[in-house]
UniProtKB/Swiss-Prot annotation:
Domain notes: The RxLR-dEER motif acts to carry the protein into the host cell cytoplasm through binding to cell surface phosphatidylinositol-3-phosphate.
Gene source species: Plasmopara viticola
Signal sequence range: 1-21
Top-level taxon in the UniProt lineage: Eukaryota
Extent of Low complexity compositional bias: 148-161
The protein's name: Secreted RxLR effector protein 32
């Protein structure tokens, strides 16, 4: 077993001397190649070193191990094949896009030509619409103004009619309120004759006070009213209000009073 250790140590020394003698070479890369059994039953991997020079191309600057050289070469070949396959697919896709683009352009040329032919007709229609639209807008504005004015007039007339109708209602309501105010408040118990007489006296006193105040304010008008009430029309009137004619007197007929009495007595 000691001999194996010595052999491994000698190999390591030889490798170190080679690296020192060749300064242009790259750093050594260790690759496991051989396995040896130790006395303890474990595997001690003795790694012989293989030195590879760096190429000037950066593509080739890859760590290559002694045991993995074939694998790396296979990988590189596979990578090249993959790259070529990608290039082929890209070229196919580009060709398809070109052909499809040409077809799309050819299909779009027809509607473009048709649009160019119909363009002047469309512009004429647009100009006609622009001419018609302002006239319609003006007429609609005029109609709106007229309708608003008519609505205002209708509202004003309706309000005036409502005021005319409400005036008599207002007068009736005020009269009812005045009557309600003049009425005495109802008592809880039933009113007696004394309470009724007292209420009548109070009303008479209030009316007399109001008359006196009216006389004091307007004495002339009060006097005129009193005179009109006391004046009696001497001419009698019938039911229709027409004045009755007085019966003829004997003097108006040219007959004396005695003869008249005699005639009357005979008639009796």
């Amino acid at each position: 077993m000691r001999g194996a250790y010595y052999v491994a140590f000698a190999l390591l020394v030889a490798a170190s001397t080679r690296t020192a003698a060749e300064p242009d070479q790259a750093e050594p890369h260790i690759a496991p190649n051989n396995d040896y059994m130790t006395s303890g039953g474990a595997f001690n991997k003795m790694l012989p070193r293989r030195i590879l020079r760096e190429s000037p191309d950066p593509k080739d600057r890859l760590p290559v191990y002694a045991s993995d050289e074939e694998r790396m070469v296979n990988r590189l070949s596979n990578g090249n094949s993959i790259a070529k396959g990608l290039e082929r697919t890209i070229m196919k896709a580009a060709n398809v896009l070109r052909t499809n683009g040409e077809d799309v352009i050819a299909n779009a040329a027809k509607p473009i030509k048709n649009y160019n032919r119909l363009r002047p007709k469309l512009e004429i229609k647009k100009s006609k619409r622009q001419r018609i639209e302002p006239t319609l807008s003006k007429s609609s504005e005029h109609k709106l103004h007229t309708t608003s004015n008519s609505k205002k007039s209708l509202v004003s007339s309706a309000s005036a009619k409502g005021q005319g109708r409400d005036e008599p209602r207002a007068t009736v309501n005020t009269a009812k309120k005045m009557q309600h105010n003049h009425r005495s408040a109802p008592s809880r118990s039933s009113p007696t004759s004394a309470d009724v007489s007292d209420g009548r006296l109070e009303k008479q006193l209030n009316a007399q006070k109001a008359i006196n105040l009216d006389k004091n304010k307007r004495p002339d008008e009060a006097k005129i009213r009193n005179k009109k009430q006391h004046v009696i029309d001497p001419t009698p009137k019938n039911e229709n209000g027409q004045a009755l004619r007085a019966p003829p007197t004997p003097e108006s007929l040219g007959i004396g009073g005695k003869q008249c009495t005699v005639r009357i007595g005979r008639e009796k």
